[in-house]
Amino acid sequence: MNYEVKEQMYEGKAKQVFATSDPEIVMVHYKDDATAGDGEKKGTIRDKGIVNNKLSNALMQKLEKEGIPTHYVQEINDRDTFVKKVEIVPLEVIIRNVAAGHFTLRMGVPEGTEFKTPILEFSYKNDDLHDPFINHYYALALGLATQE
């Protein structure tokens, strides 16, 4: 599949989204930018965009193999992927294996502490509210998820 990449539609902390010649397909470009503390701390992590692109694509392809539809269309190169244009759900899923960032402040756990079991967290992606943590009841009540 070959789509002509057009104007930028969106730029966030981790990626840029571009329109293509097909109105149902967009191109996602993964950046090396890194932020912390509600964007107060900014930096660059070499090849972060490559890792994020490759990992995201591997996960989407695995889901597709299991019969779960995704937005994945085609990896273009190390940083860019064509995906179906979708409505973004403002929900962040966080899986922690090691204590880092805000978790250490909230829970009083030393940075680098390895957990006996992974910790699953959800946050409501809203910059004005500083991405508050929510549970599945919030996600259902706010229409961010369904029981299925």
Predicted regions span which residues?
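Active-site loop/lid in soluble adenylation, ligation, and acyl-transfer enzymes
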Residues: 2-123
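A long amphipathic alpha-helix within ATP-dependent nucleotide-binding catalytic cores
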Residues: 144-148
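A structural motif
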Residues: 123-142
